[in-house]
Amino acid sequence: MILTTTTAGSATAEVTITVDKAVQRMIVTVGGQPRYDWPVSTGADGYDTPGGSYRPQRMERTHFSREFDDAPMPFAIFFTGQGHAIHGTNHLRQLGSAVSHGCVRLSVRNAAALFALVKAEGTGNTHVQIEGDDLSMAGGNGGYQQTARTRRGYDVDSVMSAGDQMGRGM
């Protein structure tokens, strides 16, 4: 008599995060099926978001930029060794415009959903694809209003509650 046991393993699906700099959108597919379509902000002039294919290198629920005045980067998914990440922002009016310092910004709520998805499916099953020309190089703005960038980074007084903004209550 041969006994076999099976354990209920967690099935993982391939997650593809595609960022199109020309239209400032992120499309997320899971197992080849579209899951999310969100507005983003990529690098402003002089702060390019590098094109190419990547895998997440590390994830940090609460991160503050050492390079840009301790700017909050909630739900950060780092995809280059130079510190480029997908992360949340509370500058919601700037989504759809190329205004970041090279990271891919999206709303905190969407960043939290993406972070949870990548954590559940695994960084090894996740691909980050950055494509398209920058808005300024594409000769258009993708139908979005271009906003001026500032060197200040984040207006800390306008953030949501610290627990909500940085995911500490989760």
What are these regions (language model features)?
Residues V40-T42, R58, G88:
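Active-site donor-binding loop signature of nucleotide-sugar glycosyltransferases
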Residues S10-G46, S53, P74-A76:
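Cell wall/extracellular polymer interaction/catalysis modules
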Residues I2-L3, N90:
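N-terminal membrane-targeting/anchoring regions of envelope/secretory proteins
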